[in-house]
Amino acid sequence: PAVNIIASPWSAPAWMKKTGHLCQGGHLRFGEWTGNGFDPMHDSFEGCYARYFVKYVEEMGKLGIPIWGVTVQNEPSNAPKWPAMMWTLKQQAEFAHNFLRPAMNEKFPEMRIFINDDSTHNLMWPVRDIVTPDEASSVDGLTVHTYEGPYSNFFNASRSYPQWMFGMTERRCMINETPEDAAHIMSGIIGNWLVRNGENFIV
């Protein structure tokens, strides 16, 4: 197909979260067991959640909708009134390396995995200081929204792991903006940088 689809979750099921609720953020039950055994890939909450991603890709494929890539979390610093879940960049990288990539490799080894998928304020520190080279090897790229934080954070992030793909996955016209303002950011500032650096997607 001419369009590559990236899937991005808002929240794990409530029973997998420390809060027990879908909405207003909350964290995955990191380091805990579901009670069915002690196999990390099948009995930890992280392993169980990773297999939800695989099942989603399978079911979408049955509907004729091929999933090209996934992000670990949509807006992981956001805790709105609707379903959401909080992650640090480090937690995303660890989950991708230890659970999501191994789970995907069983059935979808070509699946692209992206981290961040949030505004650039999450990228104030060098990504290499947060994500280890081993973790980076399980990640295909980093995606951003352009609501908060300087755009230079995004540009600088590409220096840590230049082999990654970089893209923008969300932007809307803010209350104090015109459509032309938003277009300038998407196609002008971010879009031009992506093209100059050989990147190929704005979603």
PLM ranges: what are they?
Residues P1-T132, Y147:
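Substrate-binding cleft and catalytic face of glycoside hydrolase catalytic domains
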